[in-house]
Structure formats: structure tokens, C-alpha cells
Design a protein with these regions (language model features):
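Conserved P-loop
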Residues: 1-65
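Conserved catalytic network of the ASCE P-loop NTPase/AAA+ motor domain
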Residues: 4-7, 44-47, 74-78, 115-119
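Localized chelating/binding microdomains
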Residues: 6, 29-33, 39-44, 90, ...
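Loop/turn-to-beta-strand initiation segments
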Residues: 11, 51, 79-83, 118-128
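Short, ordered loop/turn segments at secondary-structure junctions
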Residues: 17-19, 88, 128-129
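A short acidic (Asp/Glu
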Residues: 24-26, 95-97, 135-137
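Phosphate-binding/switch loop-helix module in NTP-utilizing enzymes
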Residues: 58-115
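Phosphate-binding/switch region of NTP-binding enzymes
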Residues: 114-181
Length: 181
């Protein structure tokens, strides 16, 4: 989704809750599509990098403010139709944040994500389903995934990665959707 948008000159907003986004990957992607002649003309890495707007959140409070306030305003002003969010819940697993605040914050984020969808913004959440000591915080991922339209799990096998589609709210309904090598 994002790579095709970037190649067409469409801006993409990226929120990084993992602090692992690597801009060099985008530059490598540009070199790869150019060298394999997957595009009609050379795509300079700088061109793609100018179209990605990155916001990092280091605490759950920053993540909530970014998703509920800053991201919608930015998307509107920039005319960006795509938002990618890495590690939405990573900062919420911090035991320093009181659970009642975390749960309320996640609810506000889900509402904000639904508003983005209503505004025709494509949103991709990429998160790990982590197993934590806290049973209550382990419920955050299922809560978010059950509020999404589509949930895909990337599963590694000998032939590469393939995606398993889970039906939100119905984890027992699973279909294989495709392979990525």
C-alpha cells in the first residue's frame, strides 16, 4: 500500500511507537524498484523520503496525542490519504502508566482511528501481539484488533512469509490470504 502510494507521489504519514523505523529501507526500496525496472523512470530515494512524514511516540501519552490530535490535523493539512502506525500499543505496555488511564486512552485512539476511516484515510497498524505478565495489558491487543476491519498475521515458513487473515472479534475464523517471499 505505502510503496505504491510513494511511487505515485502520494504523501504518507508514519507514526512510530517502536522507535525502529529505518529510512534507509525506503532508500533501498527506491534503488531496488529502479534497478529491477519495476517503474518507468528512475526513482531517487530522496523523492520517496520527502513524501514520508514521521512522528515518534516514546510514551503512551505521546502516542495518544499523536493519534487523536496531531495525526488527523496533519493528514488534513498535507492531503495525505495514508497513515501507517508501527507499534501502536508498545508504549502502553509500560507498567508506569496506570491501567485505567491506558484503557481509556486506547478507547480514545480506537475512536480516532474510526474517524480517520470515515474521512477516507487508509490506516495500517503494524504491531506485535506480545505476551506480557500483566493479564490486563494482554487484553489491549485483542481489544484493538477486534475494532479493526481486517487483521492479518504474518507467519514465517520455509518458503517465506504468508499472511493469515483473522476475522476481528472472531479469532477462530481464519483464512490464508497470500504469500510474501
Amino acid at each position: 500500500m505505502a510503496s505504491h502510494a510513494l511511487l505515485r507521489g502520494v504523501p504518507v504519514a508514519l507514526v512510530d511507537g517502536t522507535n525502529r523505523f529505518d529510512a534507509y529501507y525506503i532508500a533501498e526500496f527506491a534503488r531496488k524498484v529502479t534497478s529491477q525496472r519495476l517503474v518507468k523512470q528512475r526513482v531517487p530515494p530522496e523523492q520517496l523520503l520527502r513524501q514520508i512524514y514521521v512522528a515518534r511516540a516514546f510514551t503512551c501519552y505521546q502516542m495518544e496525542a499523536t493519534i487523536t490530535e496531531r495525526l488527523p490535523a496533519f493528514l488534513r493539512n498535507a492531503g495525505a490519504p495514508i497513515a501507517i502506525i508501527f507499534g501502536l500499543l508498545d508504549t502502553f505496555y509500560d507498567e508506569q502508566a496506570p491501567l485505567f488511564e491506558v484503557q481509556a486512552s486506547v478507547g480514545r485512539i480506537i475512536t480516532a482511528l474510526h474517524r480517520l476511516k470515515a474521512d477516507n484515510i487508509a490506516v495500517l497498524l503494524a504491531s506485535l501481539d506480545m505476551k506480557l505478565e500483566s493479564k490486563e495489558r494482554n487484553r489491549l491487543f485483542p481489544r484493538v484488533s477486534s475494532a479493526m476491519d481486517h487483521v492479518l498475521e504474518a507467519v514465517e515458513s520455509e518458503s517465506g512469509y504468508h499472511f493469515i487473515k483473522e476475522m476481528p472479534g472472531h479469532p477462530d475464523l481464519i483464512t490464508e490470504t497470500g504469500r510474501m517471499h
